[in-house]
């Protein structure tokens, strides 16, 4: 079941202490209203009743979207995730057939949700993003891009956002024809080789491209 607890939060602006609901695990079928609040950040946004300041709180939690068989563990503090990886890697339980992921930041978690909502496979998206990274480093190193994220705008158009020091500096449209070409030509082989992989990120993409050729 979903697990949460009230914790005392100190406002970063005025210093007032206020109770805030912190989630250890979220199950969307038990809390349907939380699904949208996760996506618009309100599930994790602290609002100070004293001064009106707001802040997005980053902490570790497990996200369970049961209706789509998705489990994502968010290691927002960047700590060791080996214990959670061992748990998620277990077989022969109710989570067989799930898409299980471990991400190391809140932004990476939000990206996984956007990819899920768009109906794409995050492994193929990550492989495409890896080639985008290669192009950026070969031709635009002076731009000092340090993050690239999949995103969807208000019109439903998918793309990649390029960030530097936390600020968006550029974007490009997502090539759905390339996605389809990779899916059609390599999905079965990719799925057979990586079905149980938990960490689907840039390092994973570089490794799997080298392995699969």
Q: What is the meaning of each model-derived region?
A:
Residues 33, 105, 173-175:
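General structural signal for secondary-structure boundaries
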Residues 47-132:
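Domain-exit/linker segments immediately C-terminal to small folded modules
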Residues 1-77:
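N-terminal cysteine/histidine-rich coordination modules
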